[in-house]
A protein has these predicted regions:
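Flexible coil/loop and intrinsically disordered segments
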Residues: 1-502
Length: 502
């Protein structure tokens, strides 16, 4: 608009499509305003009040999802993404620093790409990488410092911005826009940006002793705008809003540095944990597995449990080493699920808390080389079982399956009383799909199917290390085997409360 008013002739390149757009603007200004003063006033108004929403759509959006998204965008802006509305409302409350906080928000909002590069950049060695990480952690509450030192991915000013290049100078291109303007690293965060916003707000309010209301309502993403309006926007002063923006950046850095991300894959499912502690592979692997366990045991309504545990530990001015973080997370998790609550009789089919199955699988993985001992006389099946345990990946499998079926499809000689049938020793937790496949098959058939998973003669995977242990060490199933297996697994859970280094 300013170029139209100034009629600047010094543009080195003419973009015909851009010129067509500018002509449309000139026509509008000439039609609706009589004087240059009115046109200038209107142009200044548009410049100060217009907001551009630049949104990267997820790769997994299908055509139906895209149609719905653009329908919302076309309905006069009333149904924009909730976090976009929150962003505008928060920025409107600020009296200064809007530009830096806008850039910071835009960067942390992209959960598909780490906002902080933990691994080495092309232009640095290992010591330089560690120094950059230390500096980022030290500056974690200061978006301006992070921006000045180019510590966040995507926050460095481009050459065009620095040289004052305008839209009018942009050269026309015949190439179609790239599918992704910023290439990701092949992973995405364990939570959406809306979930992350709510986690940050919840902790922010709790630290200030403010009311958060009912948790299920608070963490419902459908209430995102209302929650922010009620809890922060309507009550927060300029200083509090700035503090929240800084907190948002801080927590996103800590999340990227210290918590797992989900790897993108073609049908595969695994986690990644970037770390500057390259020499501590075993400690990083243990931490990754434990964080995976915490994650699959949570939902958007309960993310705050592990999120607060994590931030409590890592919100310091120095990097936290993986073995220290694991020990601290486990200690806090032990407090959340105390040993006193662990009762064998409570681990039955009707009452069991699924957390105990995930905790048990983690402990079996942790002690895999003790439980699946490999020696000169080790059977091929145990060797294969150890290999499976080494590569185990936690998933959100929540279907409780009876090893000895409730209603066998074939005549089964094993007759169980209800207490034995529903006892912990006869239960495993797998996916609903695998549960349906195994369903009412008798023990020998289930064991044969598991063995076919191990030797890859049948497609499928081991979804429970408890199940792997049961089928590896029991050729047949009986009341005695159920009790022996149940007691062995229960003792592993009991012993999991010993010191981490044991």
């Amino acid at each position: 608009m300013r170029d139209s008013l100034d009629d600047d002739e010094s543009v080195p390149y003419e973009n015909k499509k851009m010129e067509k757009g500018l002509k449309c603007i000139r026509t509008y200004l000439d039609t609706h305003f009589e004087s240059d003063e009115e046109r200038t006033k209107y142009a200044e108004y548009v410049y100060k009040n217009m907001t551009f929403f630049v949104t990267s759509l997820p790769d997994n959006y299908n055509q139906s999802s895209l149609n719905k998204y653009f329908e919302r965008m076309n309905s006069t802006g009333k149904n924009l993404e909730g976090h976009e509305i929150v962003k505008v409302k928060l920025l409107h409350k600020l009296s200064a620093n809007k530009e830096i906080f806008t850039k910071a928000w835009n960067r942390v909002a992209d959960m598909d790409t780490p906002c902080f590069k933990v691994r080495r950049r092309d232009d640095e060695n290992e010591s330089g990488m560690k120094e950059r990480i230390k500096k980022a952690i030290l500056y974690r509450f200061s978006p301006q410092e992070l921006f000045n030192d180019n510590l966040l991915n995507g926050l460095k000013e481009s050459e065009e911005e620095a040289s004052g290049c305008t839209i009018k100078n942009v050269k026309e291109s015949s190439k179609a826009p790239a599918k992704n303007q910023r290439a990701g690293d092949g992973s995405h965060s364990v939570m959406s940006f809306s979930d992350f916003l709510l986690q940050c707000l919840y902790r922010f309010l709790c630290k200030k002793g403010k009311d958060t209301g009912d948790i299920t309502v608070f963490f419902n993403k459908a209430n995102l705008v209302d929650t922010f309006e009620k809890r922060l926007i309507s009550q927060g002063c300029n200083q509090e809003i700035e503090e929240f923006f800084s907190t948002l950046v801080c927590y996103r850095i800590l999340l990227d540095v210290y918590f797992i991300r989900i790897l993108d894959g073609q049908g595969d499912y695994d986690y990644d944990l970037e770390t500057p502690f390259l020499e501590k592979d075993d400690a990083v692997k243990t931490l990754k597995m434990f964080e995976s366990m915490l994650y699959v045991n949570s939902s958007p309504v309960t993310y705050y449990q592990w999120f607060n545990m994590l931030i409590d530990i890592v919100n310091t001015d120095s990097p936290v080493e993986p073995e220290i973080l694991f020990a601290s997370l486990k200690s806090k998790d032990d407090e959340t699920h105390p040993k006193e609550k662990l009762k064998y009789d409570a681990l039955n089919y009707e009452d069991v808390d699924r957390y105990w199955f995930w905790r048990l699988d983690f402990q079996i993985w942790l002690k895999r080389r003790e439980l699946f001992i490999v020696g000169d006389d080790t059977t091929p099946q145990i060797r294969r079982a150890l290999n499976v345990a080494e590569k185990y990946v936690f998933k959100r499998n929540r279907s409780i399956e009876h090893i000895a079926p409730q209603t066998p499809l074939q005549e089964d000689t094993l007759k169980l009383e209800k207490n034995d049938l529903n006892s912990f020793g006869n239960l495993v937790m797998i996916s609903s799909e695998q549960n349906s496949a195994l369903s009412n098959s008798i023990y020998q058939e289930k064991r044969a199917r598991v063995e076919s998973f191990l030797d890859s003669s049948r497609s499928g995977s081991i979804e429970s290390l408890k199940m792997l242990h049961a089928f590896t060490f029991n050729k047949s199933w009986s009341i005695e085997a159920i009790k022996e297996h149940g007691n062995a697994m229960f003792n592993i859970l009991l012993n999991s409360y010993d010191n981490v280094d044991k």
